[in-house]
Every structure is written in C-alpha cells, then in structure tokens.
C-alpha cells in the first residue's frame, strides 16, 4: 500500500526534514530520493512543489490507475500542464514496470544533468556551484528547469510505452524479473 502524506507548501526544508525524521522514528534509512522529494515539496518559488506532485501522482497512477478520480480533486495540480500529460495512466493496465519515485527522479536527473548521484541533485536544487562551493539562485532556477524537462520526457506516454516495449522485447515477462531485490 502506498501512503501519501500531504505537506503544506509553506514548510521549509528543515521543517520537512524534521517531519521525515519523526515519521521515520523506527530507524528506516532515508534515501537520497527522499531528500530530493522533500526539497522539491518545500520549494514554491521554482515550482518544486508541483514537480513533486507530478512524481507522486505519476508513480501512484502507474500502480493504481483508479487513483485518477482522487488526483483530479487536487485543483491546484489539475490546473497545471502536467495533469493532462499523465492522464493517460488512468487507462494504463500495463504492470510489467511500475516506477517508484526513486526510478523517476534518477532517470530524469541522469537524462537532464548527465549525472547519477541524487545527492548532487539535492545540492543543485539548493543552488550549489560545485566549482566555487557557493550557492547561487541562477543554479536553483536552471536546475529546476532541467529537472522539469527530464520529468516531462519520463512521463511522456510514447516514451514510456516504448520503454515498456523494449523491456518486453528483451524477454522480460514479469515485473519481478526487473527488480534487483527479487
């Protein structure tokens, strides 16, 4: 079962991190993608909060297409360009590959930034200049724009369907074969 926790968009990264720590009091290690998602959720200036919803909703719909009626009740999200771009998942019954938010963030990040460490994405979304070790607003803006483009490529119906066809063409018949944690 996928749990969805809705956080107020006005929370800053420290407050979001504190919430994660409290929820995670049983000691489960947080992944870098958890930190990326919390960073995005806290950012309303550059649309990170909306991108976080795209990631959440896409991954949720990929597993459970009947979640769509609930998603469209989010009127803020419904007004964005992304709502129509992921609507196709409401009718998708393919279950050989159901990406989670780690998959989606990693692919979008590698595609747009030619980097693989999600900890670098957290730094870039914070505006870190890796050469000068300073934090710059233009890096934040550029990073959110690049991430947005990577997410758009990931959620594109044609691209996603082609990827699923490639998986099937490679001989995979079950999602269990794709998971390294069989």
Residue ranges and their predicted role:
Residues 80-182:
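A cross-family structural signal marking well-folded subdomains
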Residues 1-103, 107, 115, 165:
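Basic- and aromatic-enriched surface patches that contact anionic nucleotides/nucleic acids
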